[in-house]
């Protein structure tokens, strides 16, 4: 089971496992916690479980083409947004509205290779207000198969 790779976090793992087994996946999850506790890693594992060619939507095999592409971050239905520095000399990182709009365009299409499109927004708190407002609509009314 791919969730075996996630250290600790027993309660969140049980919640995710139960949702996958019941086939009742909400359109969004918020992974919150201290830095380096495995939030992004867990999101990747959920993405693999949702798109695995062998065991989806309950688990991932970590061997099929879909799992391997997600692991390498090259799956065409996986989108990962990371905040970028607002300027070369700045320490502040930000997610801008242009990045969110580009993601929204990509999510409008049906999955190309997998079962479902997955967007992982790392450090979502770094969105500027315009980006956050724009993304709110996607959260409230997600496109099909996302």
Name each model-derived stretch:
Residues 127, 142-146:
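Sensor-1/coupling segment of RecA-like P-loop NTPase cores
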Residues 2-130, 137:
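Clamp-loader machinery-focused feature within the broader ASCE/P-loop NTPase space
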């Amino acid at each position: 089971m791919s969730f075996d790779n996630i250290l600790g976090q027993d309660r969140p793992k049980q919640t995710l496992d139960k949702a996958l087994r019941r086939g009742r996946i909400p359109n969004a999850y918020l992974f919150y916690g201290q830095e380096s506790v495995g939030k992004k890693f867990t999101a990747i594992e959920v993405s693999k479980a949702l798109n695995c060619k062998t065991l989806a939507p309950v688990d991932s095999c970590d061997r099929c083409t879909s799992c391997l592409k997600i692991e390498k971050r090259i799956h065409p239905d996986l989108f990962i947004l990371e905040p970028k520095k607002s300027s070369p000399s700045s320490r502040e990182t930000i997610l801008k509205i242009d990045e969110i709009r580009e993601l929204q365009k990509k999510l409008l299409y049906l999955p190309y290779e997998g079962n479902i499109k997955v967007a992982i927004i790392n450090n979502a708190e770094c969105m500027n207000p315009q980006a956050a407002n724009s993304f709110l609509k996607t959260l409230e009314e997600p496109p099909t198969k996302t």
